[in-house]
Amino acid sequence: MKPTLLVLAAGMGSRYGGLKQMDGLGPNGETIIDYSIYDAVQAGFGKVVYIVRGYFLEQFKETVARKYSNVKCCDGTPLEFVFVTQELDKIPARFTLNPERQKPWGTAHAVLMAADVIKEPFVVINGDDYYGKDSFRIAGDWCRAHEGSEGVYAIVGFELDHTLSESGGVSRGICHYDAEQHLTNVVEHLNIQKDADGVVRGDNSVTGEHVELAAKDLCSMNMWGFTPDYFAKSGAIFETFLEQNLMELKKEFYIPYAIDCMIKAGSAKCDVLSTPSHWFGVTYKEDRPAVVAKFAELAREGVYPTPLYK
């Protein structure tokens, strides 16, 4: 069984000031998605599903997909690609969209867009985050171990200290889990940064307190492992969400919220998988030079070929 990689690439990139998913950062203009796909193929994945916005679908296909025409899976078969759009009006038929809403419905809604094209265990990632080789290996192994299972999902947790930006505070969901390494909840913390004294601090979004955080705390970078039964469970929660928030202009349906609902209802468990990989990405424009330098370093060290694709 070859897992599927689901890439969330519909984000607007407002803080960065452009479509981060299409920004060339590698030595030969490679995008972060290019590296994610390379790592996923090496980890045994067989299909890539992109979730994009309709207005840049064709540009996205031309810029990204043409690079992979010669990419083969581990078994020598061609890597499969599917493109799906996330649009505001893609909601259950019994609901009528508020015509004033412009904001996308959120990450969990984006995942639901792929329900008809994914029938195997799959991994969700952001299109503008670099997760590292070990993360894809760990997530791919989890998928293969859970083929045919239901109600057990996974989150790949990154050490908080491996996810900070030198250009400003970041928001991170801190993972809390029990003795069996099952997720209990994800608590969003805002404005996280390392202070002058070397201590990491941030604002707890639940209590409002400015708190000290451990550098080794595991946090979510939106890398999840799911089996196909997730779609039905999440779809039912989305309908309840719409019943309560249909007329809201800003409320979003996020993956951690859907998972939290399942955990509270006892309908699913979520394994917390720890990765040694360092995350990096372009949260702010000021992050870009450091990311470009990091990819150049990885190429010099032989971690990746250059160019990445031929």
Residue ranges of each PLM-predicted region?
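A C-terminal functional module that forms or caps the active site or interfaces directly
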Residues: 235-268
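A structural signal for short hydrophobic beta-strand segments in well-ordered beta-sheet cores
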Residues: 22, 175-177, 272
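Hydrophobic helical membrane-anchoring modules
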Residues: 264, 269, 279-310
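Catalytic beta-strand/loop signature of glycosyltransferases that borders the donor
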Residues: 218, 270-277
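Conserved core of the sugar-phosphate nucleotidyltransferase
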Residues: 133-223
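Conserved nucleotide-sugar donor-binding
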Residues: 223-234
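Conserved N-terminal catalytic core of the sugar/cofactor nucleotidyltransferase
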Residues: 1-7, 13, 30-124, 131-132, ...
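Short, surface-exposed amphipathic charged segments that create phosphate/polyanion-binding patches used
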Residues: 93-104, 168-173, 286-290
